[in-house]
């Protein structure tokens, strides 16, 4: 095998640590496979954790409603029983099948080897649209935020939210009861969020600054003030702040996945009823994959994960049973 010395070859490597990826990792453990998750974001949970951790989800079986982050936390707790290896802030650049049948995955940090691969990358890698002002980079990971993982850290703070879509309005409304002051800044007079959400915003104690755009951030180690400029009159105002949240949306892309030799249809990976791609040993599940009649829901991804794992197990271990025992008889 062309494997680096002391480099472990995993049974299953999962690309993408969203809800489908987390359940795939758990189920891989159920099949006694060694499992690794590679995730490009700083945390597990995919869009649930990055975009709307405090929102409720209503279409997951067995939950009348469940907060997005709570669902992620439950999935992490579930898979922890089998202790999968987790690699965060790693994006897979190349994926190739070697002559010996082992898959080689090269990321921005290191090289991984695996007997099979399951891609659960959602809509692909996504990154926030960043605030394009001079010097913004030095404030990131301090008090300039593109991801919000814990609302409580904004308690009693003066918070400014940039954006006019659903996420910006939702975050403003969730911060309104706990922040000392929350201001939402949008470059247009009208918001793009749902009408009911906008109505709630207008009836809240949140301050609304429209049509304004940020033109300068002031502060040494952290942002202390934000300079806003009126879009029409060019009048400038200065706001004192403790934290700034940017909600300009996210840019998602399959990126390097398009170069891995997989059959791609409309930015999705084509799979068969085994969740198998056109490359034997590579499978896909969740929103990243497509087939006739495909429905893109978290609940569907949870169903596709065991199919992918069971077929991956049969691929790298032909003596393994495709149909596993029921979990109730295993614990």
From Swiss-Prot:
An example GO BP is: cell redox homeostasis
- Enzyme Commission code(s) on record: 1.18.1.2
* Reaction equations catalysed: 2 reduced [2Fe-2S]-[ferredoxin] + NADP(+) + H(+) = 2 oxidized [2Fe-2S]-[ferredoxin] + NADPH
| Cofactor remark | Binds 1 FAD per subunit.
Give, as one word, the top-level EC class.
oxidoreductase
Highest taxon above the source species: Bacteria
Q: Which cysteines are joined by disulfide bonds?
A: none
List UniProt keywords, sorted A-Z: FAD, Flavoprotein, NADP, Oxidoreductase
Record-linked InterPro entries: FAD/NAD-bd_sf, FAD/NAD-binding_dom, Fd--NADP_Rdtase_type_2, Ferredoxin-NADP_redctase_2
User: Binding positions for FAD?
Assistant: 20, 39, 47, 52, 92, 126, 287, 328
Its cofactor is: FAD
Molecular function terms from GO: ferredoxin-NADP+ reductase activity; flavin adenine dinucleotide binding; NADP binding; thioredoxin-disulfide reductase (NADPH) activity
The family note in this entry says: Belongs to the ferredoxin--NADP reductase type 2 family.
Query: How would you summarize the oligomeric state and partners of this protein?
Result: Homodimer.
Q: What is this protein called?
A: Ferredoxin--NADP reductase
Naturally occurring in which organism (per UniProt): Bacillus cereus (strain ATCC 14579 / DSM 31 / CCUG 7414 / JCM 2152 / NBRC 15305 / NCIMB 9373 / NCTC 2599 / NRRL B-3711)
């Amino acid at each position: 095998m062309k494997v680096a010395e002391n480099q472990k070859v995993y049974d299953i490597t999962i690309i993408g640590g969203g809800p489908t990826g987390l359940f795939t990792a758990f189920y891989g453990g159920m099949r006694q496979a060694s499992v690794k998750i590679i995730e490009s974001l700083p945390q597990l949970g995919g869009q649930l954790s990055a975009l709307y951790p405090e929102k409720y989800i209503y279409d997951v079986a067995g939950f009348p409603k469940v907060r997005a982050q709570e669902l992620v936390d439950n999935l992490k707790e579930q898979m922890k029983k089998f202790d999968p290896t987790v690699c965060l802030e790693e994006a897979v650049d190349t994926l190739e099948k070697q002559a010996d049948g082992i898959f080689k995955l090269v990321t921005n940090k290191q090289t991984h080897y695996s007997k099979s691969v399951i891609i659960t990358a959602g809509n692909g890698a996504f990154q926030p649209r960043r605030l394009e002002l001079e010097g913004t980079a030095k404030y990131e990971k301090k008090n300039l935020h593109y991801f919000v993982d814990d609302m409580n850290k904004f308690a009693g703070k003066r918070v400014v939210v940039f954006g006019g879509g659903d996420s910006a309005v939702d975050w403003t409304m969730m911060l309104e009861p706990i922040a000392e002051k929350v201001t939402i800044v949008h470059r247009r007079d009208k918001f793009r969020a749902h009408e009911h959400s906008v109505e709630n915003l207008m009836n809240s104690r949140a301050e609304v600054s429209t049509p304004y755009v940020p033109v300068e951030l002031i502060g040494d180690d952290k942002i202390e003030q934000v300079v806003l400029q009126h879009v029409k009159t060019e009048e400038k105002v200065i706001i004192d702040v403790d934290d700034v949240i940017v909600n300009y949306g996210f840019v998602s892309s399959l990126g390097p996945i398009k170069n891995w030799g997989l059959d791609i249809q409309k930015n999705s990976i084509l799979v068969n009823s085994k969740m198998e791609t056109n490359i034997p040993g590579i499978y896909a599940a969740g929103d990243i994959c497509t087939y006739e009649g495909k429905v893109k829901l978290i609940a569907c991804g949870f169903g596709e994960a065991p199919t992918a794992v069971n077929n991956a197990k049969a691929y790298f271990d032909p003596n393994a049973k495709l149909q596993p025992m029921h979990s109730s008889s295993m614990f």
